[in-house]
């Protein structure tokens, strides 16, 4: 174990789903034989964190729980079986904290589908604390010297949308429509799509979000509160429909609409998780147009490495708002109102 590790730390914890989010002193966890102990400097805040707190997904959380799964910090200790890491390395805590590494899914690099997957901020205390543990195999390697506040959202939001774009099977010059284009996921999806050579159409609401979309390099913006017919407008703007659609919004209706404006032989990718939602697609339309509808979960270790590399080369940058960890409850309030533009990051020292 390294020196100067305190016994207690500041963190945000809740004891029942939907209960009070308490900013308080809690114990510093001890790393297991296969784990790193990471001094978390910054953590992104994801919509999944809100679901974990509310407990409204069909997967139960551990309780009590420290949320968060976009933690960026410095390795300060490690278990005796850890290899390939050293004290002082920059490391990231991802949604997938650990997996069995021996099942069919892990063997095929689909670790997120592992039946024994351990999830940061859900089944494993996450990054809304100053010190957190992560399986050394799954922890993300971050180049030393990286701005940890800016890289934090890449660890989930960035990896997730990058994997989704890969799942759309697009080629340079193709149109990709991003539903929810100016939120935490969408704002990164726009940049990854541009960096991958795609033409980007964004769907969201409001002048502030339209400006952000354009500032990020998006080509055509549709305000869903003003458009009279979104499918028709997408088809007209793209001269035939989007080759791929990335659904990061939490609107069941938006998902249904996307099956109507995707191009023949195109792919609709589902990422956002509206509560109790169903994906509705006209079977005749889907068959005759040869449309694919796929779900895209989080990326694997290779996707993570590639997503961070895009960031390190300056090709993507999360539009972030940095506030103190103690302000987390107010961020959740903004999330529930749909009032967030870009991505919130919490500073664990405040």
Curated annotation (Swiss-Prot):
The gene is ADH1. Zn(2+) 1 binds at residues 46, 69, 156. It is found in: Cytoplasm. This is Alcohol dehydrogenase 1. Belongs to the zinc-containing alcohol dehydrogenase family. Binds 2 Zn(2+) ions per subunit. Coiled coil: none annotated. The keyword Oxidoreductase applies. InterPro entries: ADH-like_C, ADH-like_N, ADH_Zn_CS, GroES-like_sf, NAD(P)-bd_dom_sf, PKS_ER. Zn(2+) 2 binds at residues 100, 103, 106, 114. Homotetramer. Its EC number is 1.1.1.1. GO terms for molecular function: alcohol dehydrogenase (NAD+) activity; zinc ion binding. GO terms for cellular component: cytoplasm. The keyword Kinase does not apply. Transmembrane segments: none annotated. NAD(+) binds at residues 180-186, 204, 209, 271-273, 343. It comes from the Eukaryota. The lineage of its organism: Eukaryota, Fungi, Dikarya, Ascomycota, Saccharomycotina. It catalyses: a primary alcohol + NAD(+) = an aldehyde + NADH + H(+); a secondary alcohol + NAD(+) = a ketone + NADH + H(+). Keywords: Cytoplasm, Metal-binding, NAD, Oxidoreductase, Zinc. Its cofactor is Zn(2+). It is an enzyme of class 1 (oxidoreductase). CDD domains: CAD3 (cd08297).
